[in-house]
Design a protein with these regions (language model features):
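N-terminal beta-strand motif that seeds the catalytic metal site of vicinal oxygen chelate
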Residues: 1-22, 34, 74-83, 123-130
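Tryptophan-centered motif/residue detector
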Residues: 30, 38, 65-76, 109
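Acetyl-CoA-dependent GNAT
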Residues: 57-60, 125
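Short, acidic, Ser/Thr-enriched surface-loop or helix-capping motifs
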Residues: 114
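A short, acidic/glycine-rich surface segment
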Residues: 61-67, 130
């Protein structure tokens, strides 16, 4: 048995959910739907069921540390964005307000940090989707 999905999303905590959703709106070109409790950013133009990111305001939010250490806040998840050109994507992400992580583990992809401290990766497409 499998779930009968009608969509899926990931939730990102932030001490400034509005700013973080605006960053991803610019980075991804998705549509933002502000709400009272959450802000949602959705890819409404894709085929099939929709994908969206929910941004949750957390007043005592502690950003994760990259790379992880045992004595500081660790990431609970991270986003991977597969792009046609990693270096162009890095330049664009930087112009949107991301920073490049100080430590990179591979030459083929880049770890970036969003304005709330969440790491995300920019990678080439995997071979199975080409």
């Amino acid at each position: 048995m499998a779930l009968n999905l009608v969509g899926w999303n990931v939730v990102l905590d932030s001490d400034n959910a509005d700013e973080l959703s605006a960053f991803y709106e610019k980075l991804l070109g998705w549509t933002r739907f502000p709400g009272e409790e959450f802000t949602v950013l959705a890819n409404i133009n894709q085929k099939g069921f929709p994908t969206w990111i929910t941004f949750q305001q957390v007043d005592n939010y502690v950003p994760p540390v990259w790379p992880a250490t045992t004595d500081e806040q660790q990431q609970m998840e991270h986003l991977d964005f597969h792009v046609e050109n990693v270096e162009e994507a890095v330049k664009y992400a930087l112009s949107c307000g991301a920073t490049m992580a100080g430590i990179q583990y591979d030459e083929g992809w880049r770890v970036m940090i969003d304005p709330s401290g969440h790491p995300f990766c920019l990678l080439p497409p995997p071979p199975w989707i080409k």
